[in-house]
Structures are given as C-alpha cells and as structure tokens.
Amino acid sequence: MKTKFIKRIAAAGMAVACMVATTISAFALEGRSNWNENGYSVDMKVYTDYLTGYAEADSNYTIEEMRLDGVVSNPYSHAYLYAYGENTYYISDSAKLQYGVDKVEANYYFYTSEGYEHSQYVNAGK
C-alpha cells in the first residue's frame, strides 16, 4: 500500500518536472551567426534565459586569434559581446554570465588581410 502511494507521487513529480522543463525552454532565446571565407570560419552564438537570468555569448574564433593567424590586418578590428539587463555588461570574446540579463548581442567588425570589410552581428533577447 505504502509502495503504491510512493510510486504515484514519483509519477506525478515526473509529470510536473516535464511540464516545467518545457515551460522554461519557451523563455530562452538563442541566436547564431556564421561567416566562412578562404577557409576561415567565425561562428558566434548567444543565448539568453529570461527565467534564470543566465546569458552566454561565445565565439569559436577570437579577434586576437585572427590577428595571430594573419586573417585580420586592421588594428581597429574588434569583437563586442554585450549583455543587457539591469546593467550593461561588456563580455570578452567568450563568456558566461548569470545576472538579470534580458538580451545578449555580439558584434564582430574587422578588415581581412585581403582588405575586405566584414561585420557580423547576432543577438538573442527582448
């Protein structure tokens, strides 16, 4: 008798957990941007979860790495990753945050070694 009761509680708990997981995913946004040229690839990803305030911004290829590889020639080239919420936070090329974040955006701007101007932008949030 006691075992049946415990099994029913466990089953009900699992059903609630599944509903909560589905609801939470509805409050998260992800944005991606990819650039490929001459064998080089920049893949930027931003993610914002409204319920937890967790935000993540990441790039597989930082501006500093691009300079070292000779892809970027202009010293004014930059990568901006920002998180917006109660305050605005500047993030480095790769970061994870847990604040009251509403939106994350990433912006790459550089001149390639061939002299081409490139700008890449992605965001996720309100």
Stretches found by the model and what they are:
Residues 1-47:
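N-terminal prepro-regions of secreted/extracellular proteins
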Residues 29-126:
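Mature secreted bioactive peptide module from preproproteins
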